[in-house]
Swiss-Prot record:
PANTHER family: UPF0178 PROTEIN YAII. This is UPF0178 protein DMR_20710. Transmembrane segments: none annotated. Belongs to the UPF0178 family. HAMAP family: UPF0178 (MF_00489). It comes from Solidesulfovibrio magneticus (strain ATCC 700980 / DSM 13731 / RS-1) (Desulfovibrio magneticus).
Length: 150
């Protein structure tokens, strides 16, 4: 099992939680981004730097992810592709994307996009809070215990 992170917009506290978990549990973490990243030196952590372009990071993750892997992303279309490949997806606020909820998430994303395009200001998500960080850490820990046994 590997953990892939859509690291371009990944909040630093979430990246730090992932790095600590990978080192502590000996699980491969692959940070995929189109920019240089800072991360602790560890045999369990690698970075894949991709070229600029729309959804290039997503394409690399989808190409590499295997059933049972975990992908960390706030990108709902990417999460849908991951779930379709029988892998798992978790967003930086600790919410799991599953076969049961992904279609609803895609529909809501589409609706909000239409509202923005029509001039209705919908705003973005609020800044990552301490509660969000805690929820992410708890969900990650629960997932790793369930799927890796450690």
């Amino acid at each position: 099992m590997k953990i892939y992170a859509d690291a371009d917009a990944l909040p630093t506290p979430i990246k730090d939680i992932l790095c600590r978990a990978a080192m502590r549990r000996g699980i491969a973490l692959v940070l995929v981004a189109n920019k240089a990243l800072r991360f602790p030196e560890s045999p369990h952590i690698t970075a894949v730097r991709v070229g600029q372009g729309f959804d290039v990071v997503d394409g690399v993750i989808v190409e590499r992810v295997a059933p049972g892997d975990l992908v960390i992303t706030a990108d709902i279309p990417l999460a849908a592709q991951v779930v379709e490949k029988d892998a798992h997806a978790l967003n930086p606020r600790g919410e799991r994307y599953t076969r049961d909820n992904i279609l609803g998430k895609l529909a809501m994303r589409g609706l909000l996009s239409e509202l923005r395009d029509s001039g209705v200001v919908t705003g973005g998500p609020p800044p990552l809070s301490n509660r969000d960080r805690e929820a992410f850490a708890n969900q990650l820990d629960q997932f790793l215990r369930q799927y890796t046994g450690n």
